[in-house]
Amino acid sequence: MIKLYNTCMDFKCLNDVECSHPEKILGPHLEDAYIIRAYIPIARAAFILIDNKKYQMIDNGKVFEYRSDNEINDYKILYIDDSGYEKTIDDPYRFRPEISDYDIYLYGTGRLFEAYKTFGAHLKTIKDVSGCNFVVWAPSALSVSVVGNFNHWTPGMHPMINVNDSGIWALFIPGIKENEVYKFAIKTKNNEIKMKTDPFAFYTEKRPRTGSIVINDDFHWTDNSFKRSENALSIYEMHLGSWKRNNGDYYNYREIADMLIDHLKKTGFNCVEIMPVMEHPLDISWGYQVVNYFAPTSRYGKPDDFKYLVNRLHENNIMVILDFVPAHFPDDDYGLYMFDGTHLYDYEDPRMGRTPDWGTNIFDFGRNGVRSFIASAAVFWIDKYHVDGLRFDAVTSMIYLDFGRKPGEWIPNINGGNINLEAVSLLKEINDYIHNKYYNVITVAEESSTYPGITSESGLNFNYKWNLGWMHDTLDFFHEDPLYRKYRINNLTFSVMYMYSENFILPVSHDEVVYGKGSLYRKMPGNKNEKISNVKLFLSYMFSYPGKKLLFMGNEFAQKNEWNVLSQLSWNDLDDGKYVMELIHDLNNLYKNDFNFYNDKNFSWIDFNDKTNTVISFNRGNAVCIFNFTPVERENYAIGVDYPSRYIEIINTDSKKYNGGNILNESIYACKYPMHGRRYSIEIDLPPLAAVIMEPEDLNGSSGN
């Protein structure tokens, strides 16, 4: 026990909600006697219960006190509130909150990358007493207290301990159980009390309510046998709330699971990328303005429901990637912004700390506590939710200090440059940690600049980078009237110049089908049939081109309208789109199972100079890929090939299987007529606005895959 002496000043800090060391006043103490104190501002009377006997506690300005000549080790407190309600509690201050000095040290040095195991709300049993251990970082706060229904949301009734004056506050509260709603009441140096959500909350109330919820982490996983794909990666990007709706309302994570699995099997994708599930207040932010980085949104259910979704996907050999937003956070008053009355999580200077385009706050990547927080938020989803990868959003905005800013609106780094050295080092550290600890988990950068080494081990060490240059150039080409596409062939050939500079994913993402940009279908010129043909041609080109694949939901069946986050996909478009979906299934199977296509190094041009016919062709290994970008059939079109073999057509987007005109090339024998630098050639009938993919028959009589 601690020896202390009672002074009115000690109690004043409690009544003023400014107590940073309540353990020095409350709980059991040895002074001139054995004294037990409890601060219960909502009580009109309090009693101590010892060996089933009740003793009156003295009210000293809502600090209730009991004195004894004998040491008391086991007791409870009964209080009566102003309404006459009686409640019996264990005294939080006879327990030491659980946080190690080493964790405090690591968090303060920016190297506690699994801080979620310590911070937040954790159900525990201490000295045979069950309760919840709360830990939060708020270094500039005068006091922090836990509030909830258990104390009538009264600030100061459960003041936390500023452990070692580290700015990390902790308190074990007995009796707290699963599903208890809580917040932190933070007294700032401006004499304000802010009611804040727990930055490490693992579950929250459904919007518009903002309370954090205590959960028990006891989900039973059955995905031990799941193996992540190491070769082909075909990603279906989706937004859970607008994929399908249940009579206008959201489906639960569990309800989504089997519907999604069935759809992915029909289309052949082996990976799903889910737009941010981390809790966010605003539906129309799509999830990219996150407040609770450790909580799956309660829009679609509870944390165990989301774990169920991931587990079911793994049971069906489908990988799961989550979008992760480490760059910035919103202004919502209950969240990270001005958390302890200061710019704790963001840069204070708006030239560093404010995004000019999005009106959000940029994380202070140089503050060690923030580094621990962001890194832990990334690792958390891999550790606790078994996800197979993270797609880091807005990496360019993290790297560049002048991102979206005019001259004079940004602060150079210590070398006078425009690189945020703190952000760059943090990204590198997070990637290194993940790759060292988790086998075959992938990280992906959405990065649009020419910053070098995004996917190199000596650079930022991401596994993949979105090839946004390829995406924009290719979509611009397809948007062009076929009559003029011959003047834009460079749009297709330019990306080959840098295709191996990074490990790329070819994305056709949500960003390209919103804000008036139109759906993939609407981007295409021509009448309805020509638009569908162009979509099939585009998808075939994408799946033939080196790089992993990513396609946003709706594009797999050529949805006509652009994406609307407030409604479900236009599933009625499947009447026409089912043929596109059949093609996607076949393209995915080809890509996943044929080494020629999933080995990104297998690429060589056959011909990119036929601007007259607007036809290009290339090899993927020994496969021959030919693309006719005009609505004109090219009969007896000659292509150079490497083998004196019979060539088998494995994809033809004009096939009746895909509702095309059925101009086919079932088998073509190569002749000894050199062409395009090859010793042999074949002549094919090339359908209008179509892709044809052929492979040579091998010695065993099958196509060479």
Curated annotation (Swiss-Prot):
Biological process, per Gene Ontology: glycogen biosynthetic process
One Pfam short name: Alpha-amylase_C
Catalytic reactions on record: Transfers a segment of a (1->4)-alpha-D-glucan chain to a primary hydroxy group in a similar glucan chain
SMART domains in the cross-refs: Aamy
A GO term, aspect molecular function: cation binding
Top-level EC class: transferase
InterPro entries according to UniProt: A-amylase/branching_C, Branching_enzy, GlgB, GlgB_N, GlgB_N_E_set_prok, Glyco_hydro_13_cat_dom, Glyco_hydro_13_N, Glyco_hydro_b
Domain of life (superkingdom): Archaea
Enzyme Commission number: 2.4.1.18
Annotated active site: 393 (nucleophile), 446 (proton donor)
GO cellular component: cytosol
Pathway(s) where this gene product acts: Glycan biosynthesis; glycogen biosynthesis
SUPFAM superfamilies assigned to the protein according to its UniProt record, in alphabetical order: (Trans)glycosidases, E set domains, Glycosyl hydrolase domain
Keywords associated with the record: Carbohydrate metabolism, Glycogen biosynthesis, Glycogen metabolism, Glycosyltransferase, Transferase
HAMAP family in alphabetical order: GlgB
Family to which this protein belongs: Belongs to the glycosyl hydrolase 13 family. GlgB subfamily.
Chain's role: Catalyzes the formation of the alpha-1,6-glucosidic linkages in glycogen by scission of a 1,4-alpha-linked oligosaccharide from growing alpha-1,4-glucan chains and the subsequent attachment of the oligosaccharide to the alpha-1,6 position.
Subunit structure, as described in the record: Monomer.
The name this protein goes by in its record: 1,4-alpha-glucan branching enzyme GlgB
Originating organism: Picrophilus torridus (strain ATCC 700027 / DSM 9790 / JCM 10055 / NBRC 100828 / KAW 2/3)
Gene (name only): glgB
